[in-house]
Structures are given as structure tokens and as C-alpha cells.
């Protein structure tokens, strides 16, 4: 079953953020756009490259009024040490969520039971807590977080402009499409 246009289910997890431990719930996501980025585990190889990419794009997320949450199946205690020891992860200014009970990874369909890890999944969630984009793929392939920013902005645009769609490779400020009978066969 697709998670697109479904409400984020209730949850409560702990995270490491800005030098302290915090609690994150589904209510934490409401009132702003949110991006959940699931990763297999702390202290791995591709995960720090993605966190660094997210950190390098964090200004774009903030300009768009969105918060980023990194989620692994480790504890928030592990994330504290990871943040303190990894130069790439140390750049993160967003919450690093620990999901050792697999509450979130199961709810978002990215849990790998036989490994106790998460698949690489990315979810853009609107201010009402509704999932608008889903990307899940193999753990051997790291994501381009710049593409996640593009998808966030496209989701925001279409939310603000009902009846319009963002074509392939659409970037903020570019022309969109208004589907109609007149467009059929002309694109």
C-alpha cells in the first residue's frame, strides 16, 4: 500500500539535536513542512555522505520553511557520539532520531527485519502531517539531497496552486502545467 496522501501515524521517539536529547512526535511535524530521511545505521559509510549533503542543503530546507529529520535504527545516544566524532555528521544542525524499537521504520515501510536496519527512504510531509512524496531504494545507493529539496519545493508549489502540476526536472520559478483537454497530445 502506498503511503502517499496518508496521515503520519502517532509516534514518540528520541533524538539528538543541538547538543541535547529531545523527544520527537507526530505533532512535532505539524505546522511546517518536514523531511524524514531514513538511513541504515550510524557509523557506516554512505550515511555520513548523505548527512553532510543534507547539512550542505539545510539552508535551502530552512528557506522553504522545512525541518529535516535523520532516522536510523540506532539509539539517540549513538547519534550523540556519531555527531561528536564524524566530521560529516558533525555538520548536522537537524535532529538525529534514534529508532531502536523500529517504530518509525515499520510505520514508514523501510524496516529490514532480518538485518534490524532501515532502507534508504525519504518522505516529504506537509504541515498537516500528510505524506506527499516517498522515495525508497537499496542501501548501496546514496541519495542526492538537492533532489529532495526540489521535490519539497514542487510539493509546496502544487499545494499552493491546486490544478497545476510540476513537470520533469521542474525547479522553483520555472513554468508549470495546468492539465486540460487542450494539452492532450501536445506535450
UniProtKB/Swiss-Prot annotation:
Reaction catalyzed: a hydroperoxide + NADH + H(+) = an alcohol + NAD(+) + H2O
Gene Ontology process terms (BP): cell redox homeostasis; cellular response to stress; hydrogen peroxide catabolic process; response to oxidative stress
CDD domains (alphabetical): PRX_Typ2cys
Domain Thioredoxin: 2-157
Enzyme kind, highest EC tier: oxidoreductase
Location(s), subcellular: Cytoplasm; Secreted
GO CC terms of this entry: cytosol; extracellular region
Record-linked InterPro entries: AhpC, AhpC/TSA, Peroxiredoxin, Peroxiredoxin_AhpC-typ, Peroxiredoxin_C, Thioredoxin-like_sf, Thioredoxin_domain
Annotated EC: 1.11.1.26
Keyword terms of this UniProt record: Antioxidant, Cytoplasm, Disulfide bond, Oxidoreductase, Peroxidase, Redox-active center, Secreted
Active-site residues, record numbering mapped to chain: 47 (cysteine sulfenic acid (-soh) intermediate)
GO molecular function, one term: thioredoxin peroxidase activity
Coiled-coil region list: none
Main location: cytoplasm
Family under the similarity heading: Belongs to the peroxiredoxin family. AhpC/Prx1 subfamily.
Complexes and interactors: Homodimer; disulfide-linked, upon oxidation. 5 homodimers assemble to form a ring-like decamer.
Note: The active site is a conserved redox-active cysteine residue, the peroxidatic cysteine (C(P)), which makes the nucleophilic attack on the peroxide substrate. The peroxide oxidizes the C(P)-SH to cysteine sulfenic acid (C(P)-SOH), which then reacts with another cysteine residue, the resolving cysteine (C(R)), to form a disulfide bridge. The disulfide is subsequently reduced by an appropriate electron donor to complete the catalytic cycle. In this typical 2-Cys peroxiredoxin, C(R) is provided by the other dimeric subunit to form an intersubunit disulfide.
Purpose of the protein: Thiol-specific peroxidase that catalyzes the reduction of hydrogen peroxide and organic hydroperoxides to water and alcohols, respectively. Plays a role in cell protection against oxidative stress by detoxifying peroxides.
Protein name, as recorded: Alkyl hydroperoxide reductase C
Gene that encodes it: ahpC
